[in-house]
């Protein structure tokens, strides 16, 4: 008897992950992952008020269900009251990413929200027109075709490291990914209290069978200047709100 083919769900949500090398080595992670059989998993987190990265709460969930002929994977996450080292703040990070599979993979960015972003004491407005363009491209092939004709989408892809062929179409990496930023600006750099910060906004990886969204990634390194009296420079990486959805039929 032949082995029965079945669909294996794959969904992951990371609300907060950090690798901090200074002032002391720490790994911090909070994540949920969906079993291959589907179902639903959720997690509600709070954060140590004395930590370098603080938030009021973070809620994460992943689900996998079949609707008729379609296998749907849905990843959801929201973070409220974010504060990174006292220099990066956001009122709300929220995202819902869905993958649907019938004969091919299609994706839908249901919600991608960044509200009340403050960087080193200054309010930073973000433009989400690239998100609107990406939403109109549920498959990799449609995104490639749109990028060849849309200068703003092409600029976003190029700023995230995507290369282009002679005809102006984006060229996926060896892993089959296209990268872009869903917000403009896609990155912000600044220095504060003896630390250099590089903040990446709305990093999005698009492949034929998978999409991954990282809402905020913060890279921190000590500068040559000393930290203020009583303070400490910071070194490490912080990731806030990362979603990944896909799935496949096996064997």
Tell what function each PLM region has.
Residues 1-251:
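Extended, solvent-exposed, non-transmembrane regions
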